[in-house]
């Protein structure tokens, strides 16, 4: 089976192991019925998994109901952390939630302290599983993947980059985001036009997988030239070249350092995790039969 060590010279995974493991689980173990409550910075800390039998759907009222339940659960976790911070670790007085939090923290080899609980209570984040979505992405990618890999090859770029749409769009050819990005590569209009894709009333080449792949290859080539390594170039696909160049000026070219130190209103969970999601997506898509058999 494929392991990330096979591509490590271009796409280093050292130091990212825990993050990759988290996303591997989100892609393969947890489906749309599952929502993980976890720490947004330390992805080893998964406090709870809430199951919704209706999954993501149907209708807005179901979505609202789920968010209400998750909001309450987040408050319960935060309150449990406050209690641990104030009352200490007397196991006789602990409820199930407090015991669970303590177990999770200790299994990550962290030292429980009032300061730690104070920090963690503000970091509780939700992440829904996307197993079904990822499986569909594997099936859809089969149509064009060989040609997409050839495109990257032609540009002298690593073929693994052709797997980035697993993270961007699950290879949904008609994908449109609320922000106005479209196609498997989720190009915004302005970027698409800058890379010579035609976007007007009669044609939108962002929805043409092969034309968009060629534009994405040129974008990533530019990013790599400007930023100097693949972790930064790939992160810039989510965060923008300018933002990552600024982060590099401040903190150097190691993505791990940037993730822990760079402060910016727009450099949040999605940007911090984009590169590791790519690593997990490469690993899962190359090993998908191990997880699910033939699709």
Show which residues each predicted segment covers:
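Cell-wall polysaccharide-cleaving catalytic domain and substrate-binding groove, primarily
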Residues: 168-184, 213-220, 239-242
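Short, surface-exposed glycine/acidic/tryptophan-bearing loops
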Residues: 119, 175-196
């Amino acid at each position: 089976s494929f392991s990330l060590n096979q591509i490590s010279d271009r796409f280093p995974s050292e130091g990212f192991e825990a993050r990759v493991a988290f996303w591997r689980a989100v892609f393969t173990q947890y489906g749309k019925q599952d929502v993980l409550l976890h720490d947004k910075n330390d992805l080893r800390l998964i406090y709870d998994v809430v199951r919704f039998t209706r999954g993501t759907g149907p209708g807005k009222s179901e979505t609202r109901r789920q968010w209400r339940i998750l909001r309450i659960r987040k408050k319960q976790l935060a309150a449990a952390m406050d209690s641990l911070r104030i009352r200490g670790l007397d196991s006789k007085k602990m409820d199930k939630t407090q015991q669970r939090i303590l177990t999770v923290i200790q299994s990550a080899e962290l030292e429980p302290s009032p300061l730690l609980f104070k920090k963690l209570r503000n970091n509780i984040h939700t992440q829904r599983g996307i197993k079904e979505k990822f499986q569909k992405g594997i099936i859809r990618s089969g149509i064009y993947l060989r040609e997409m890999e050839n495109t990257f090859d032609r540009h002298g770029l690593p073929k693994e980059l052709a797997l980035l749409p697993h993270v961007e769009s699950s290879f949904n050819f008609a994908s449109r985001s609320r922000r106005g990005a479209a196609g498997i590569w989720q190009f915004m209009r302005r970027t698409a036009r800058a890379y010579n894709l035609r976007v007007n009333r009669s044609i939108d080449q962002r929805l043409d997988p092969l034309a968009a792949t060629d534009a994405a290859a040129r974008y990533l080539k530019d990013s790599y030239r400007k930023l100097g390594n693949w972790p930064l170039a790939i992160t810039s696909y989510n965060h923008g070249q300018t933002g990552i160049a600024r982060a590099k000026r401040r903190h150097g070219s190691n993505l791990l350092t940037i993730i822990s130190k760079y402060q910016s209103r727009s450099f949040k969970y999605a940007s911090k995790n984009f590169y590791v999601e790519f690593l997990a997506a490469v690993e899962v898509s190359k090993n998908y039969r191990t997880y699910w058999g033939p699709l």
